[in-house]
């Protein structure tokens, strides 16, 4: 590299009041300090603003996540409470259904007993009626047969005096 043009430019600038120090040990430390100082001074506001915005975004994100977490916890608590109430209600419905089923079963059994008793009574009444009808038929048959035999025997055995006595006795029995 050719240092000569730089040296000439530095000498000319020095003659006018501004000069470059070409001593590498002195210039690097001073230049670095100046650049760092300017960088810190100028960039502090920009980086402070950028970092502040980023910090604000992160804080807002954290608050939003915390709010959603609290809301989720509240919804979970509500859901658990609803589940508990639903379980209690289901147990009540089940108990009520069992009670109703037992009551209906008892009513059906009672009604069946009543119906069985009614059928037995009807059967007994029908049997008594049938027995009565058969007895009546037997009596009528016996009386009919007796009358038929009597009619066969009476004309020869019954004279007028016997007929009067029978009539008188029958009249007395009616009084």
UniProtKB/Swiss-Prot annotation:
Any one GO MF annotation of this record: proton-transporting ATP synthase activity, rotational mechanism
Keywords for this protein: ATP synthesis, Cell inner membrane, Cell membrane, CF(0), Hydrogen ion transport, Ion transport, Membrane, Transmembrane, Transmembrane helix, Transport
Record's GO cellular component terms: plasma membrane; proton-transporting ATP synthase complex
Natural source organism: Gloeobacter violaceus (strain ATCC 29082 / PCC 7421)
Subcellular location: Cell inner membrane
Primary subcellular site in the record, as a coarse category: membrane
Family the entry assigns: Belongs to the ATPase B chain family.
Residues making up the signal peptide according to the UniProt record: none
Subunit architecture: F-type ATPases have 2 components, F(1) - the catalytic core - and F(0) - the membrane proton channel. F(1) has five subunits: alpha(3), beta(3), gamma(1), delta(1), epsilon(1). F(0) has four main subunits: a(1), b(1), b'(1) and c(10-14). The alpha and beta chains form an alternating ring which encloses part of the gamma chain. F(1) is attached to F(0) by a central stalk formed by the gamma and epsilon chains, while a peripheral stalk is formed by the delta, b and b' chains.
Topological category with respect to the lipid bilayer: Single-pass membrane protein
InterPro entries: ATP_synth_B-like_membr_sf (IPR028987), ATP_synth_b/b'su_bac/chlpt (IPR002146)
Domain of life per record: Bacteria
Alphabetical list of NCBIfam families matching this protein: PRK07352.1 (NF005606)
Main function: F(1)F(0) ATP synthase produces ATP from ADP in the presence of a proton or sodium gradient. F-type ATPases consist of two structural domains, F(1) containing the extramembraneous catalytic core and F(0) containing the membrane proton channel, linked together by a central stalk and a peripheral stalk. During catalysis, ATP synthesis in the catalytic domain of F(1) is coupled via a rotary mechanism of the central stalk subunits to proton translocation.
Lineage: Bacteria, Bacillati, Cyanobacteriota, Cyanophyceae, Gloeobacterales
Protein name: ATP synthase subunit b
Segments passing through the bilayer: 22-42
Record's keyword annotation contains Kinase: no
């Amino acid at each position: 590299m050719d240092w000569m043009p730089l040296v000439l430019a530095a000498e000319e600038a020095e003659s006018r009041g501004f000069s470059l120090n070409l001593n590498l040990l002195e210039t690097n430390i001073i230049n670095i300090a100046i650049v760092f100082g300017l960088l810190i001074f100028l960039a502090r506001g920009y980086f402070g603003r950028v970092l502040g915005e980023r910090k604000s975004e992160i804080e807002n994100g954290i608050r939003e996540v915390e709010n959603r977490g609290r809301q989720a916890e509240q919804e979970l608590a509500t859901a658990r409470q609803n589940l508990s109430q639903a379980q209690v209600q289901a147990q009540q419905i089940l108990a009520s259904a069992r009670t109703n089923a037992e009551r209906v079963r008892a009513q059906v059994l009672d009604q069946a007993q009543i119906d069985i008793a009614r059928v037995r009574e009807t059967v007994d009444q029908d049997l008594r009626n049938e027995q009565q009808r058969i007895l009546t038929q037997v009596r009528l048959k016996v009386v009919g047969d007796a009358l038929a035999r009597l009619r066969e025997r009476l004309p020869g055995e019954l004279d007028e005096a016997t007929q009067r006595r029978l009539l008188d006795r029958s009249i007395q029995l009616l009084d």
